[in-house]
Amino acid sequence: MEKLSVIVPCFNEQETLQDYYDAISKVRETLLGKECELQVILVDDGSKDKTLAKMKELSGQCSWIRYISFTRNFGKEAAIYAGLTHAEGEYVSLMDVDLQDPPELIPEMLDIIRQGEYDCVG
């Protein structure tokens, strides 16, 4: 089965992580129906709130969620790079945790990239 890794950089996102989890969990079910596993990599970029605690909670509940934690704020690009180095999927998506880009679009993007005409879909 193929795998899609979603890299999610986070900085002080304790309030939005649960909403993101709720949305991406539904997407996971859709992807499994398309013969694709989901791996979510949450990257804590030195948050000062309880973002890391929430990440630990979610990863403890779900084997398909992993987290990486920085000791201080290194910036979004460093968080993305760290996530990419741990991605296991044949496909990778970068996504902000604030749901600005709806996770519900991921299955449609997967369908497009699987057609083989494109190397990148956004």
Residue ranges and their predicted role:
Residues M1-G122:
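Structured catalytic core of nucleotide-sugar glycosyltransferases
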